[in-house]
Amino acid sequence: MTTGNKHLPTTTVTPARVRLFQPTQRPASRAGEWIETSWGKCKVDGRLGQRHADLLEAILYCAERARPEDAGTLKLLIDPARVRQVMSDDRYSLQQLWRLLRELRECTIDVETPTMHIMGGVIESAEHTEELTRRDPLTGGERRLWTVRLGKAWVELMRLDLPLRYDPSPITRLRHGISQAIARHVLTHRGEPQGGWVIDGLIGAVAGDRDGQARRDARRRLREDKAGLVGAGVTVCGDRVHRLRPLVAHSPDGVAHPPDGVAHPPEFSAPLQDPQGLSGP
């Protein structure tokens, strides 16, 4: 089954809303402390940051075949050259991608919302062997393909949560993790509060309470990514953030859109179909 972002979601709305991935490209290892938001809560044993989100979204966006397995995992066929192309402009070696895959495999997530409670792994396994190859037009030789097994917990999250489908390339090219986290958060909303989101409110939504120098640094980094954010469908104007899509205006929520308020409808309103419908030939 050729996906090209047609049959598998790039991600779902909950990870960005419950702060599953730290808003940095250099995440610290977490030891299972709960992070609570009004959309739900999560905890992570391991290391998950925006580069891990980049890779996971790139894998789902580039997956060429998806086959459900009896254990509840989902086996994906991946061309690593396409993943590298989505991830960056020659900034990532295969060894670096493999390190991110290892950290994704080693972590355990626990996500709880009013409609679901899921605990388990993100990736069950990854492998590349000489049995699956493709001609490399640059060298004339063969390059090895990957098979990546999504963990049962992530497969269930895709099945139960609301899917989002977009090209992750513009987000992966942003310089700062805080900008990536804010872009991912904004894209979980179909509409925006009247006047847009206040920057400080979004910083709080993706990074928790920050004040003083930490907040000023976050604002500065977001503005440094202003041009790149436009490619992701997000614009920064003064102290406000807007979506660059047809929007449905919402009434003001007092001050800026409170990061932990009632969720706006997501970009796509139907949950992913049963993974059995994802089988390739």
Description of each model-found segment:
Residues 1-281:
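Charged, alpha-helix-forming regions
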